[in-house]
Amino acid sequence: MNITQIIEKLKQNEVVAYPTEAVFGLGCNPFSQSAVEKLLILKQRPREKGLILVAPKLDYFFSFIDKEQINSQHWQKLQQTYPRPITWIVPAKKDIAKFLCGNFNSIAIRVSQHPAIKILCEQTGFALTSTSANLSGIAPCKTSDEVRLQFGADFPVLDMSVGSATKPSEIRDLFTNQLVRQG
């Protein structure tokens, strides 16, 4: 599908596949419980685990993160450019929907410069949920053709290339810098 069709699907609270820095991600509108529920069912992902949000700028995350708990050093860390993609675990707003953060009082966010993420967020006006495009036990998809093989020929997938990263993003706690997932 082209970018316009994918944007329409996202606005209609559908789940789509789009390229990220290393693999294809499955994403949807994080403000829509029905969209997130579809994503969790499709991915067979336990609700308790929570989801990652991606966007080209921090502003897209302000509806989800507790800005009061983040000091100037933490903001610098979030705004810094790194040689590889880093997902940060940050404090979530107290009223955040549990379908996004699972059993946690935090949420994972990643500022991404991938052109697809930039265009999709700018055109929809929201961050995207991001979980790797693969069924349980199968390697994440690196091409749109692989997505169609796993999820069906009619699955809405953006026909663009993934970035140059060879591994999915590492995940770190913003406050402790503890490595949660190796990238």
From Swiss-Prot:
Lineage: superkingdom: Bacteria
Limits of the YrdC-like domain: 1-183
GO molecular function, one term: tRNA binding
Catalytic activity: L-threonine + hydrogencarbonate + ATP = L-threonylcarbamoyladenylate + diphosphate + H2O
Enzyme Commission no: 2.7.7.87
Coiled-coil ranges (or none): none
Listed InterPro entries: DHBP_synth_RibB-like_a/b_dom (IPR017945), Sua5-like_dom (IPR006070), TC-AMP_synthase (IPR023535), TC-AMP_synthase_SUA5 (IPR050156)
Pfam families attached to this UniProt entry: Sua5_yciO_yrdC (PF01300)
Record localization: Cytoplasm
Disulfide bond residue pairs: none
One of the GO biological process terms: regulation of translational fidelity
Record key words, sorted: ATP-binding, Cytoplasm, Nucleotide-binding, Nucleotidyltransferase, Transferase, tRNA processing
Gene Ontology cellular component list: cytoplasm
Coarse class of the protein's main subcellular location: cytoplasm
HAMAP family assigned: TsaC
Entry similarity comment: Belongs to the SUA5 family. TsaC subfamily.
Protein name as annotated: Threonylcarbamoyl-AMP synthase
Source organism (scientific name): Histophilus somni (strain 2336) (Haemophilus somnus)
Gene that produces this protein: tsaC
